[in-house]
């Protein structure tokens, strides 16, 4: 096994010396601006736009999905503790309060 690896490295070394080297093919200046623009254009058309389309389809399908019933309210003593009122509104509702999904310390509002 070791001899096969050693002989393969010798062959690749001989081939590498035999081939002429033209410029610096791995340097940053080796690629032109046309190639870079072509890559970004391809990424836009084949990655970004289909990604936006799939995201739009996902939003559309989620909007048509039926609503789930909310969980039953259980007044756990370690949740929804109000030691001082919130500085907005009546002081009992969070800033982005949703009466259907976010219960107050006493339960849901719309029950």
Curated annotation (Swiss-Prot):
Mitochondrial matrix topological domain residue ranges: 27-36
Record bears the keyword Membrane: yes
Membrane topology: Single-pass membrane protein
Pfam families, per the entry: COX6A
GO CC field: mitochondrial inner membrane; mitochondrial membrane; respiratory chain complex IV
Example GO biological process: mitochondrial electron transport, cytochrome c to oxygen
Transmembrane annotation, as ranges: 37-61
Intrachain disulfide bonds: none
Localization of this protein: Mitochondrion inner membrane
This protein's UniProt keywords: Membrane, Mitochondrion, Mitochondrion inner membrane, Oxidoreductase, Transit peptide, Transmembrane, Transmembrane helix
Pathway: Energy metabolism; oxidative phosphorylation
An example Gene Ontology molecular-function term: oxidoreductase activity
Transit peptide (first-last residue): 1-26
Signal peptide (from-to): none
Job of this protein: Component of the cytochrome c oxidase, the last enzyme in the mitochondrial electron transport chain which drives oxidative phosphorylation. The respiratory chain contains 3 multisubunit complexes succinate dehydrogenase (complex II, CII), ubiquinol-cytochrome c oxidoreductase (cytochrome b-c1 complex, complex III, CIII) and cytochrome c oxidase (complex IV, CIV), that cooperate to transfer electrons derived from NADH and succinate to molecular oxygen, creating an electrochemical gradient over the inner membrane that drives transmembrane transport and the ATP synthase.
Assembly behavior: Component of the cytochrome c oxidase (complex IV, CIV), a multisubunit enzyme composed of 14 subunits. The complex is composed of a catalytic core of 3 subunits MT-CO1, MT-CO2 and MT-CO3, encoded in the mitochondrial DNA, and 11 supernumerary subunits COX4I, COX5A, COX5B, COX6A, COX6B, COX6C, COX7A, COX7B, COX7C, COX8 and NDUFA4, which are encoded in the nuclear genome.
PANTHER family per UniProt: CYTOCHROME C OXIDASE POLYPEPTIDE VIA (PTHR11504), CYTOCHROME C OXIDASE SUBUNIT 6A1, MITOCHONDRIAL (PTHR11504:SF4)
Protein name in UniProt: Cytochrome c oxidase subunit 6A1, mitochondrial
Gene symbol of the encoding locus: Cox6a1
């Amino acid at each position: 096994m070791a001899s096969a690896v050693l002989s393969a490295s010798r062959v690749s070394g001989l081939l590498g010396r035999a081939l002429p080297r033209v410029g610096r093919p791995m340097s940053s200046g080796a690629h032109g601006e046309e190639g870079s623009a072509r890559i970004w254009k391809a990424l836009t058309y084949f990655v970004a736009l289909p990604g936006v389309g799939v995201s739009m389809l996902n939003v559309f399908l989620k909007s048509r999905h039926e609503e789930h019933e909310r969980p039953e309210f259980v007044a756990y003593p370690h949740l929804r503790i109000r030691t001082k009122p919130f500085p907005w509104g009546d002081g009992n509702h969070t800033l982005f309060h949703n009466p259907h999904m976010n219960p107050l310390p006493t339960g849901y509002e719309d029950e």
